[in-house]
Amino acid sequence: MSETATWQPSASIPNLLKRAAIMTEIRRFFADRGVLEVETPCMSQATVTDIHLFPFETRFVGPGHSQGMNLYLMTSPEYHMKRLLVAGCGPVFQLCRSFRNEEMGRHHNPEFTMLEWYRPHYDMYRLMNEVDDLLQQVLECQPAESLSYQQVFQRHLEIDPLSADKTQLREAAAKLDLSNIADTEEDRDTLLQLLFTMGVEPHIGKEKPTFVYHFPASQASLAQISTEDHRVAERFEVYFKGIELANGFHELTDAREQQQRFEQDNRKRAARGLPQQPIDNNLLEALKVGMPDCSGVALGVDRLVMLALGAESLAEVIAFTVDRA
């Protein structure tokens, strides 16, 4: 297709037909397992507090809201789906549009398709097995391997991420020629993320998907802290062929702890000169009622389709990327 013909889809029609077949296959996977498909709002008055996520903001003006109501496009359907879990819906999944005001490139588009699902009474490992089942079915790949966050750092960077101090992390960064970034960074988790992205990700999941689990407790996000090792969180990510595919948690159910984490995020945002975000009080109220013990995962569908089709970029599997929207 001509580079100037921006009216045309970025993906070919044959690829869009294959994408549709994969979407059908995903829905069949969950229907066969008795998981309910749900739909939740794309906009909310609250948003994520994570310092690494940047939501789109808009303003609603209508009857009863002459002064306007701030709304955020959802970066993930997580909060609404957890409220459904509290309401008693049982296991649920959703295929939806999500939005992040961040980068655009081979593996990123500001608007993308998310597959998210929650399994009451599943621990992290059982959900990892189900993710593996889905990947094998859609990608026809080998069964995944599982490595702890500590193991991948020790294997590829020869440091222990759970005990290394910032000086040791900067020394590891220097070996990767990242001193220009690391030497001025004071946040330990940001240093760890830099090392993980540049020193670990390129080496894992080459032949088969790789689960990395037990991230540091300081990176728990909405996951529980392990009862066996308080240094780590019950959180995992999945990588295949250089691409992060999914991020999952043994979900935090304690409302007070969740509020403290939201508030801590906002303090970090303020320290970095970022806007503090409105906390989702509806989620906190739901957690106070009681969410069943569960695990959940979010998976990037566009990236999954890209891998299934052997494509080189998301543009080959999305009808219209943002520059053609």
From Swiss-Prot:
The keyword Nucleotide-binding applies. It comes from the Bacteria. GO terms for molecular function: acid-ammonia (or amide) ligase activity; ATP binding; lysine-tRNA ligase activity; tRNA binding. Keywords: ATP-binding, Ligase, Nucleotide-binding. Substrate binds at S76, P77, E78, Y118, E251. Its EC number is 6.3.2.-. ATP binds at R100, N101, E102, N109, E244, L245, G300. GO terms for cellular component: cytosol. InterPro entries: Aa-tRNA-synt_II, aa-tRNA-synth_II, aa-tRNA-synth_II/BPL/LPL, EpmA, Lys-tRNA-synth_II_C. Belongs to the class-II aminoacyl-tRNA synthetase family. EpmA subfamily. With EpmB is involved in the beta-lysylation step of the post-translational modification of translation elongation factor P (EF-P). Catalyzes the ATP-dependent activation of (R)-beta-lysine produced by EpmB, forming a lysyl-adenylate, from which the beta-lysyl moiety is then transferred to the epsilon-amino group of a conserved specific lysine residue in EF-P. NCBIfam families: genX, PRK09350.1. Homodimer. This is Elongation factor P--(R)-beta-lysine ligase. It comes from Citrobacter koseri (strain ATCC BAA-895 / CDC 4225-83 / SGSC4696).
